[in-house]
């Protein structure tokens, strides 16, 4: 399925909006720090590496999504600390 750049940007914007909303409404998300996220990020990175070594395209896509979620979450957490 092919999407235009505009559609991709809108989808990514919705993704970031959801992260922002979760940081406000979800107690678990709200208490996360860079330090507390690190073990999960390491696990997701290993899962991505495993999928890459197996050349499992479906799993690679899934794990890339998980890693992207972590990167965006770190950005959200760090931005909060920069603006305080």
Name what the model sees in each region:
Residues 1-60:
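Extended low-complexity intrinsically disordered regions
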Residues 65-69:
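Glycine-centered tight-turn and secondary-structure capping sites
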Residues 79-84:
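Conserved small/polar residues in nucleotide/adenosyl-binding loops
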């Amino acid at each position: 399925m092919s999407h235009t750049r505009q559609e991709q940007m809108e989808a990514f914007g919705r993704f970031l909006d959801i992260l922002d909303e979760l940081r406000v409404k979800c107690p678990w998300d709200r208490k996360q720090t860079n330090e507390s996220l690190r073990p999960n990020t390491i696990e997701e990175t290993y899962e991505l590496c495993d999928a890459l070594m197996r050349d499992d395209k479906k799993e690679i896509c899934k794990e890339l999504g998980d890693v992207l979620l972590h990167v965006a979450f770190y950005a959200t957490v760090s931005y909060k600390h920069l603006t305080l």
